[in-house]
Every structure is written in structure tokens, then in C-alpha cells.
């Protein structure tokens, strides 16, 4: 199967912008919220964004299956080698509460690795996208800029990003191996993007969430030069039958100061 990754990613950019604006419009009108079987909230914003993104992806790649958080049957095992992962709104709680760090996510996985990744951050008017090694970008206010996470850094200024202000002991132990000086709390897959652009240096997490939560941000960060593995230094791969993520370690570079 011949896939033009660049063309597909670029054709999805206006769709992500449309879906992002729709998420804002629906929030402003007042969201309709339900509770899913797993106890997590879902809004009409999640569902509408899913519809907009999925429709365009089906047009672009009709033969490639889509696995979306909002439509997947978790009991069905994933046996695909090429597939899309969509998390229409990662950070639904942030979205519902009016915060600005929720994200729109889509990734194309090929042979266990995310190649294309798009992460929209509507309230910040940012869109991160990538389609190949060395080809990660941020679009802001209509302008596209290539991003690269490599930079010179003071050894005493290693900054971690986390979904918690106080990560658990296992994670702190790993962060201390890299002489982390401070931890900033950020929600959703936006964390991946802020490593991709060099804002933060490292992110570590225990086993959590599902593949659609990570894949798009993974592509953006890895294609910007980040090193992404499990906590025990194994490759971080996709296409697991149950969609569950292992532990995660993202580093801006091998030693974080050059």
C-alpha cells in the first residue's frame, strides 16, 4: 500500500482547524455531558469532533481502519498493522471545565509505529503536525514553523512535565536519575508537543491510558527528535490487542543537556 504521508497530513490541517473551532463553539453554547461505562465523561463536543475528523480520514484513506476512543469496541482485539488512532478530545475534563490544554488527536500507525500525527490545541490556536523524521511543525495564527527538540541546556535546569504536580515514587525515582530540577503540570497530549518544541525535557509515566491517548503526540515528538521508550528502555510500540499503554519515558535528548 503506497501512502503519501505528507499529503494526507497537510489535507487534515484545515479539518483539525474546523474541528477545533467547533469544539469551542459547542462549549460556548453549553455542552451536553454523559458518563460512559468506565465512569469517564463524554460530551457532544467529543462526538462532533470525532465525526468531523473521522469523515475526512475515511475520504482520504478509505481502506485503512479507524480506531477511535468514542466508537471502538474495546472487547474486539486489534489485529491491524496499518490503522488510524483517534482521540477526538484528550482531556475531556479540561474541555468541560473551560481550560485550554485539551487536545484533538489523530495518528496513522504503520507496523507498530505512529508515522503521521496531528495534535490540535484549539484554545491556544496551535496545531502540531508531523509526517516523517525531521518533519514536525507547529501552525499558529496561520504560520507554520518546523520544530526540533534538540537544544543546549544547563545541567541544573532539567525541567520535567507531568499530568500531576507530585508524581508517584516510581516516576520520581526515574526523574531523579536525570537530575530534574523542577516539574511543570500540563494536561493531555499537549505534554508531548511541549517536549517536541523543546519547552520541556522529559516526561515519565506508569502504565496508563490507551494507545489513542499517546499516538499523535508520540509521532510529533519522535519526528522532532525525541527519544520515546518504556521506563525499562524497551521500544514503545502500538497495535496491542487490548490497546493498553505500557509505561512511558520521553526524553528530549539522550542526556537532556545537549
Place the predicted regions along the sequence by residue.
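Short gly/ser/thr-rich secondary-structure transition/capping motifs
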Residues: 66-70, 143, 232-234
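DPxDG-like acidic metal-binding loop motif
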Residues: 78-137
Amino acid at each position: 500500500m503506497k501512502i503519501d504521508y505528507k499529503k494526507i497530513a497537510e489535507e487534515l490541517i484545515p479539518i483539525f482547524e474546523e474541528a477545533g473551532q467547533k469544539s469551542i463553539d459547542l462549549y460556548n453554547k453549553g455542552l451536553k455531558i454523559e458518563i460512559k461505562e468506565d465512569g469517564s465523561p463524554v460530551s457532544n463536543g467529543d462526538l462532533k469532533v470525532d465525526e468531523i475528523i473521522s469523515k475526512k480520514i475515511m475520504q482520504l484513506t478509505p481502506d485503512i481502519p479507524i480506531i477511535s476512543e468514542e466508537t471502538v469496541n474495546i472487547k474486539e482485539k486489534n489485529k491491524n498493522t496499518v490503522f488510524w488512532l483517534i482521540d477526538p478530545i484528550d482531556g475531556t475534563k479540561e474541555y468541560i471545565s473551560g481550560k485550554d490544554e485539551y487536545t484533538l488527536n489523530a495518528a496513522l500507525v504503520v507496523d507498530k509505529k505512529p508515522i503521521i500525527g496531528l495534535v490540535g490545541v484549539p484554545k491556544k490556536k496551535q496545531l502540531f503536525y508531523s509526517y516523517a523524521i525531521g518533519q514536525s511543525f507547529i501552525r499558529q495564527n496561520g504560520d507554520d514553523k518546523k520544530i526540533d527538540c534538540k537544544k543546549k541546556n544547563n545541567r541544573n535546569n532539567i525541567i520535567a512535565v507531568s499530568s500531576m504536580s507530585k508524581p508517584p515514587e516510581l516516576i520520581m525515582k526515574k526523574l531523579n536519575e536525570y537530575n530534574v530540577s523542577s516539574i511543570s503540570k500540563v494536561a493531555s497530549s499537549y505534554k508531548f508537543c511541549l517536549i517536541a518544541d523543546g519547552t520541556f525535557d522529559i516526561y515519565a509515566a506508569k502504565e496508563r491510558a490507551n494507545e489513542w491517548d499517546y499516538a499523535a503526540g508520540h509521532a510529533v515528538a519522535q519526528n522532532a527528535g525525541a527519544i520515546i521508550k518504556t521506563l525499562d528502555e524497551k521500544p514503545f510500540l502500538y497495535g496491542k490487542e487490548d490497546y493498553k499503554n505500557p509505561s512511558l519515558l520521553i526524553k528530549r535528548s539522550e542526556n537532556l543537556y545537549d
